[in-house]
Amino acid sequence: MKKLKVALLANAKENAPNFEELSEDQWDDLDSTKTINAIVEAIKSGGNDCEFLEGNITLVDNLIKYQPDICFNICEGHFGDGREAQVPAILEMMRIPYTGSKVMTLALTLDKPMTKRILHWHELPTPEFQVFERTDEPLNDDLRFPLFVKPSREGTGMGVSGKSIVKDENELREQIAKIFKRYKQPALAERYIEGREVTVGLVGNLVGPVARRLPHDENLPRIQTGLHFFPPMEVDLEPFKESDVVYSNRLKVDLADQLNYVCPAPLDVEMIDDLNWYAAAVFRVTGALDISRVDFRLDASNNWKPYILEINPLPGLSPGISDIVIEAAAEGIEHHELVNMILDTALRRYGIKKQASINY
């Protein structure tokens, strides 16, 4: 059996556009050359050929030249409200299989308010919120301070700092204005949940009939068939409590190698069971595929009730730094094994036979 030709599609930071109007954190969610090289080598270690292709306007020509059997997609995109969906749209036009979620899911989940509307409709717990298109929009009567304010369509904690927690109208308007000026997009304000922040990573695909709403039957299975859940992770923010009371962009980017990642997070079995169930539910209602990471806040004032913040169907895969990589490592799964788990999951979904596999 011949080796598969796998194209790693990514947006490298060193290849990103550069001009004066860009904010200083514009490309924080793009991948480093180190990460890209690590994923290429991981795919090769699974017995397949792999080549990195930049996910920009050169992609179509390079795909025609390389003729991949499947693409391993981690492209974040450069511009546009649906930038994470742009490369998958090209791949679907060219009828090339790829890992991860499809166009609609990637466009949806980049838009945090739209995702929260979907979660709310499905009766999944997410903090009450309001979207601000103007700085002078009145605050809804049902929202109370403190609120948490962030850009509607950014990742990697961009636009998030200790000042994102606003306690009055003046602070709210100040943060909204900053987001408008810096990111040129609507601001999302949601009820601030005082408590702990944890994240759950998962690989796989749902099998069989799955409820779209929370089941009322307590005897139904709590863990969805077909998904592999990694141990939940929590970041210890105690050493940074004077400067960063939340998991900010500064911590995620500038200080990532100095953080204490607690994984598995100290949670009881019932809480982990609930988090996994909610993660599976979000995975289902957003149409995610192959891999995702779901972020939660646990409400200290309400018996640590979980609230869903967002789902990331394109979680970072930087060795030793990205959340889902750390979660997998806590289970004894090394970086190259995780990468091949994701690839193998997509290959099974497409019915593509692989050359080799790794025992996990």
Model-derived segments and their meaning:
Residues 1-10, 64-67, 107-196, 204-209:
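Active-site nucleotide/adenylate-binding loops and adjacent lid/helix of ATP-dependent enzymes
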Residues 1-98, 104, 109-110, 133-139, ...:
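ATP-binding N-terminal substructure of ATP-dependent carboxylate-amine bond-forming enzymes
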Residues 6, 70-72, 199-204, 304-319:
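A short beta-strand motif that forms the metal-chelation/ATP-contact edge
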Residues 15-19, 155-158, 242, 255-256, ...:
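Short acidic/His/Gly/Ser-rich catalytic and metal-binding motifs that mark active-site loops
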Residues 50, 97-98, 126, 147, ...:
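Hydrophobic beta-strand scaffold residues
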Residues 55-56, 187-191, 198, 287-301:
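A short glycine-rich, hydrophobically flanked beta-strand micro-motif that places a catalytic Asp/Glu
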Residues 120, 266-360:
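ATP-dependent carboxylate activation and anion-phosphoryl transfer catalytic cores
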Residues 169-277, 303-307:
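Phosphate-binding site of ATP-dependent enzymes
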